[in-house]
Amino acid sequence: MTPESQLFAAVTLINLEGDLLDQGEFTAWLDLWQHDGLYVVPIDPNETDFKNTLNYACDDHRMREKRVHRLYSGESISTTPRARTLRTLSRFRLLEANDSLIVVRGAQSLWEHRKGHSRHYAADITWQLQREGDRLRIQQKVIRLVNSDDVLHSIGYIL
């Protein structure tokens, strides 16, 4: 595959992920992941050792399933009512590509509306996508919020 075709395949998956999250299709979102994949929202924007530092989220498969369960169940006050989100993904840059792995960095502008209030969150995101047969799956997603080291409101949805 050419770098352009690898980037196109990656962006196709990334846009699908964003749409699934905004539409509340969380079970389908879980299916986009490698079983051993990691979903990370670090506090320190420069951190790379996610498993040994404090993060807003550092979710393996089990924790992603629990997060989705909370979103569907309504049992958590931070998810009731469920926030409506709309995200725009852009500025995709291919950082690495080979036959089994594609690494892409991009920007996300996410609007949340809940209980009569709208909030905006901007982030740099890095996706590590692993080829599994004829499809790509998310191996790691790191969401570096531009205001991650500031006070954040309760985020009751998946970035």
Label each PLM-derived region with a short phrase.
Residues F8-T12, R62, H120:
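A generic "alpha-helical surface" signal
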Residues L86-T88, R93-L159:
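A beta-strand edge to alpha-helix "cap/lid" segment located at domain peripheries
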Residues M1-H35:
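Short, low-complexity N-terminal intrinsically disordered segments enriched in polar/charged residues
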Residues T2-S5, N52, H117:
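Conserved aromatic-histidine-acidic binding/catalytic patches
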Residues V11, E65-H69, G156:
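Generic detector of well-ordered alpha-helical segments enriched in charged/polar residues
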Residues E17-D19, E75-R82, R114-G116:
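Short helix-to-loop capping/linker segments positioned immediately adjacent to catalytic or ligand/cofactor-binding
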